[in-house]
């Protein structure tokens, strides 16, 4: 008979809730273990089968660690601000807060139905004013340190959505959400100076136990490069511009310069003859995203401005072009072009028939750019030097003549922190009529998002908050000065930058987190989530953490010691699950038909945790069959414990049991859940063949399967006679000496041909081996004379007889 999953799951979920089984105490002598999941955005679609994969992994670890005597912090919460709720509100007229609350309730019920051991007393919600009070507090600290500032920046403006979009939210020049056209326009935006932390964000990666591929993604995103800034005067004017180059040694080979179309100097330096062509080109660029302008651009485009720059090193006049592959937001928005030694410059020069001048020997510039090292030529005081020597000498010359200086730059840009939306944290700043701006006082936080029915975009580029006069207009009570509140809101990234800290002390109204508690719990021991957050979320969270470290709020330099990305669960046809393809699997249906324990077991058994694997109904059925086999082995049809279970030891199961404890313990710790489950299956097969089952082994097995299948684990534990939960029972241990083979298989040969195989003690003497071997093959050697017996201890006996 199989078990009734619906009955058992309801029973134990009720028990855990009533007894607060997973409540994490703060004061404890035990060692700590902090297991963190990337908290979900509570969408209208509810939980999908991809969510529980990572959640089950952290839950198995959390449950094992509790049994190993750790105090475990394993929390859950909601990343609940964001565009979808606002779009829904615009489309339906309902409030984003109601929509979000409804979705959170659905998600919470779904997550609870899967039996995860979260401490729900620590639940956080980024849209709760008691939570975002501290998101705003962190913003004030950034503002005080000069790390939050206002700037005019070219942004991706989407008229249909009425907001600015990040590069990542744009695909092929259209918004990812809704497919609306996007254009570039300069706007006043809040920026966070993440670049000030570039070196530390880069260097501290070395100390982390993260996948190397993920560290590389962060390193590339930060993109540190060393080189020089060079100042170019514009011929016939007092104007100048600066370029950054990693190859100042090639300055003698510069043959033209390129400015970004948005560069502030373009309008001033363009000649009357070129004005029309330049303006037409600038307009054509407005519709392109940064990605389309750089990495996706198939051919180089550009226009000559009519102006010339003066090369500081030799006085040569270099034509100034504009081209979309140079971005105003990257570097200085200007480049010196050395087509003989740079592939991109070479393509551009070839397209527009611009001159090339070789200054490093080693290639054939009639065929392609030469970017390697070599002897410098046509370079006056650099002639004969190699690349490294020439770079050092040129930087020295630039600094002596004030024509430039040594410089380190980053690919990393400052973080565009404002959104023209309603559903986000208000930025606690007031702009006064005299042009000054001040932060809201700490004691006035949280600055609460006002309730309103009118969340349509203002159309001016400001957020819908600009429509709420009574909220936006303020008067200074001391001076009578008038002001307006900042109407931009924070991006969804803000609340998720620090949520792992709030779980440590979720109800503290006096501080972001208690210093003693944060010292106890940090760093997070393991953080599991999807690879789609590999760069931005993790980089932003590390940045905020370092700022909090600098002001003494947190005691560690890094937030997450170990990080792991789970793979994706694909549809049965190996395609990504999506509503449009109709291949989405709803976990609620599986919980109803097969049970939560089966879903958890199946997702862990599908394959390695970091692999992307297709969903399979057959695999799901197989997982349920295994749990049924476990149940039937231990429980009779009448619900009583199997009569095979006894207090007596069983030598034939001893080795299999100790092997299983060792492998499961090690595999769980290393996140190799699929192989741990395989080993448990092997043990159950052995146990079915055994005459009796020692109770000690049954209890040990139940403890091992409980982290994966907690409901059946609890039910079997109670059937074994225990009144309290299995949660804090002690984890089984193994004896290394029991893993050693006592017996070995010996091959018996006659004249070199195998005639028998014998099992005997591994310590058997040569005499014993010979005696047993001759006994086993006496039929084969009857009537023959044994000339010689060769014995290899522990391996074989070869009999020479004729």
Curated annotation (Swiss-Prot):
<keyword id="KW-0963">Cytoplasm</keyword>
<dbReference type="GO" id="GO:0004823">
    <property type="term" value="F:leucine-tRNA ligase activity"/>
</dbReference>
<dbReference type="InterPro" id="IPR009080">
    <property type="entry name" value="tRNAsynth_Ia_anticodon-bd"/>
</dbReference>
<dbReference type="Pfam" id="PF08264">
    <property type="entry name" value="Anticodon_1"/>
</dbReference>
<comment type="similarity">
    <text>Belongs to the class-I aminoacyl-tRNA synthetase family.</text>
</comment>
<dbReference type="InterPro" id="IPR025709">
    <property type="entry name" value="Leu_tRNA-synth_edit"/>
</dbReference>
<keyword id="KW-0030">Aminoacyl-tRNA synthetase</keyword>
<keyword id="KW-0547">Nucleotide-binding</keyword>
<dbReference type="GO" id="GO:0002161">
    <property type="term" value="F:aminoacyl-tRNA deacylase activity"/>
</dbReference>
<dbReference type="InterPro" id="IPR002300">
    <property type="entry name" value="aa-tRNA-synth_Ia"/>
</dbReference>
<dbReference type="Pfam" id="PF09334">
    <property type="entry name" value="tRNA-synt_1g"/>
</dbReference>
<keyword id="KW-0648">Protein biosynthesis</keyword>
<dbReference type="InterPro" id="IPR013155">
    <property type="entry name" value="M/V/L/I-tRNA-synth_anticd-bd"/>
</dbReference>
<dbReference type="Pfam" id="PF00133">
    <property type="entry name" value="tRNA-synt_1"/>
</dbReference>
<dbReference type="InterPro" id="IPR015413">
    <property type="entry name" value="Methionyl/Leucyl_tRNA_Synth"/>
</dbReference>
<keyword id="KW-0436">Ligase</keyword>
<dbReference type="InterPro" id="IPR002302">
    <property type="entry name" value="Leu-tRNA-ligase"/>
</dbReference>
<dbReference type="InterPro" id="IPR014729">
    <property type="entry name" value="Rossmann-like_a/b/a_fold"/>
</dbReference>
<feature type="short sequence motif" description="'HIGH' region">
    <location>
        <begin position="40"/>
        <end position="51"/>
    </location>
</feature>
<dbReference type="GO" id="GO:0006429">
    <property type="term" value="P:leucyl-tRNA aminoacylation"/>
</dbReference>
<dbReference type="Pfam" id="PF13603">
    <property type="entry name" value="tRNA-synt_1_2"/>
</dbReference>
<feature type="binding site">
    <location>
        <position position="579"/>
    </location>
    <ligand>
        <name>ATP</name>
    </ligand>
</feature>
<dbReference type="InterPro" id="IPR001412">
    <property type="entry name" value="aa-tRNA-synth_I_CS"/>
</dbReference>
<protein>
    <recommendedName>
        <fullName>Leucine--tRNA ligase</fullName>
        <ecNumber>6.1.1.4</ecNumber>
    </recommendedName>
</protein>
<feature type="short sequence motif" description="'KMSKS' region">
    <location>
        <begin position="576"/>
        <end position="580"/>
    </location>
</feature>
<dbReference type="GO" id="GO:0005524">
    <property type="term" value="F:ATP binding"/>
</dbReference>
<keyword id="KW-0067">ATP-binding</keyword>
<dbReference type="InterPro" id="IPR009008">
    <property type="entry name" value="Val/Leu/Ile-tRNA-synth_edit"/>
</dbReference>
<dbReference type="GO" id="GO:0005829">
    <property type="term" value="C:cytosol"/>
</dbReference>
């Amino acid at each position: 008979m199989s078990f009734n999953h619906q009955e058992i799951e309801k029973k134990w979920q009720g028990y855990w809730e009533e007894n607060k089984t997973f409540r994490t105490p703060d004061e404890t002598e035990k060692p700590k273990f902090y297991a963190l999941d990337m908290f979900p955005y509570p969408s209208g679609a509810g939980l999908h089968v991809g969510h529980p994969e990572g959640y089950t992994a952290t839950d198995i670890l959390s449950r094992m660690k509790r049994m190993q005597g750790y105090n475990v912090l394993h929390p859950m919460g909601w990343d609940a601000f964001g565009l979808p709720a606002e779009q829904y509100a615009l489309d339906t007229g309902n409030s984003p807060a109601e929509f979000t609350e409804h979705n959170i309730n659905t998600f919470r019920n779904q997550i609870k139905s899967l039996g995860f051991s979260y401490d729900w007393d620590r639940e956080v919600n980024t849209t709760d004013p008691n939570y975002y009070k501290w998101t705003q507090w962190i913003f004030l600290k950034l503002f005080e340190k000069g790390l939050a500032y206002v700037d005019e920046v070219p942004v991706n403006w989407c008229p249909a959505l009425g907001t600015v979009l990040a590069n990542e939210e744009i695909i092929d020049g259209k918004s990812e959400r809704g497919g609306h056209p996007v254009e570039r326009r300069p706007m006043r935006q809040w920026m966070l100076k993440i670049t000030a932390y570039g070196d530390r964000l880069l260097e501290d990666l070395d100390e982390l136990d993260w996948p190397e591929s993920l560290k590389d993604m962060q390193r590339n995103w930060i993109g540190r490069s060393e080189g020089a800034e060079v100042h170019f005067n514009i011929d016939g004017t007092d104007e100048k511009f600066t370029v950054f180059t990693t190859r100042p040694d090639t300055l003698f080979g510069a043959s033209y310069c390129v400015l970004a179309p948005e560069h502030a100097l373009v309008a001033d330096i363009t000649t009357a003859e070129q004005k029309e062509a330049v303006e037409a080109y600038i307009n054509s660029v407005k519709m392109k995203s940064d990605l389309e302008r750089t990495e996706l651009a198939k051919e180089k485009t550009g226009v000559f401005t009519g102006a010339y720059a003066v090369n500081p090193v030799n006085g040569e006049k270099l034509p100034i072009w504009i081209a979309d592959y140079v971005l105003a937001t990257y570097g200085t928005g200007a480049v010196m072009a050395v087509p003989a030694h740079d592939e991109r410059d070479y393509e551009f020069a070839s397209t527009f028939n611009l001159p090339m001048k070789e200054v490093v020997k080693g290639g054939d510039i009639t065929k392609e750019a030469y970017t390697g090292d070599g002897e410098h030529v046509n370079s006056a005081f650099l002639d004969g030097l190699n690349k490294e020597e020439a770079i050092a000498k040129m930087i020295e010359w630039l600094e002596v003549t004030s024509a430039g200086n040594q410089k380190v730059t980053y690919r990393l840009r400052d973080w565009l922190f404002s959104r023209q939306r309603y559903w986000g944290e208000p930025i606690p700043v007031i702009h006064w009529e005299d042009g000054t701006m001040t932060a809201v006082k700490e004691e006035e936080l949280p600055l609460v998002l006002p309730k309103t029915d009118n969340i349509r975009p203002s159309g001016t580029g400001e957020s819908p908050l600009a429509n709420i006069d009574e909220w936006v207009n303020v008067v200074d009570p001391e001076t009578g000065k008038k002001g307006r509140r900042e109407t931009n809101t924070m991006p969804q990234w803000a609340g998720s930058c620090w949520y792992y800290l709030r779980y440590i002390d979720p109800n503290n109204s006096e501080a972001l987190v208690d210093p003693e508690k944060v010292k106890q719990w940090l760093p997070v021991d393991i953080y599991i989530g999807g690879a789609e957050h590999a760069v931005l979320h993790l980089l932003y969270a590390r940045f905020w953490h370092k700022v909090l470290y600098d002001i003494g709020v947190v005691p560690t330099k890094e937030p997450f010691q170990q990080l792991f990305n789970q793979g994706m669960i694909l549809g049965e046809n190996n395609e990504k699950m999506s509503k449009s393809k109709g291949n989405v699997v709803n976990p609620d249906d599986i919980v109803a038909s097969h049970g939560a324990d089966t879903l958890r077991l199946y997702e862990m058994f599908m394959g390695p945790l970091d692999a992307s694997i297709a969903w399979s109904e057959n695999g799901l059925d197989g997982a349920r069959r295994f749990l049924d086999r476990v149940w039937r082995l231990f429980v009779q049809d009448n619900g009583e414990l199997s009569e095979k279970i006894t207090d007596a030891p069983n030598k034939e199961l001893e080795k299999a049991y100790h092997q299983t404890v060792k492998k499961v313990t090690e595999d769980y710790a290393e996140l190799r859940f699929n192989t741990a489950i395989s080993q448990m299956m092997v043990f159950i097969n052995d146990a079915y063949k055994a005459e009796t089952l020692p109770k000690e082994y049954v209890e040990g097995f139940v403890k091992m399967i409980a982290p994966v299948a907690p409901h059946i684990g609890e039910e079997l534990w109670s059937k074994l006679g225990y009144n309290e939960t299995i949660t804090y029972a002690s984890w089984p241990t193994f004896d290394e000496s029991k893993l050693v083979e006592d017996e070995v298989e010996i091959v018996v040969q006659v004249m070199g041909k195998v005639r028998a195989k014998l099992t005997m003690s591994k310590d058997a003497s040569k005499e014993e081996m010979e005696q047993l071997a001759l006994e086993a093959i006496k039929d084969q050697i009857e009537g023959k004379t044994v000339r010689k017996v060769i014995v290899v201890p522990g391996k074989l006996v070869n009999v020479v007889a004729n």
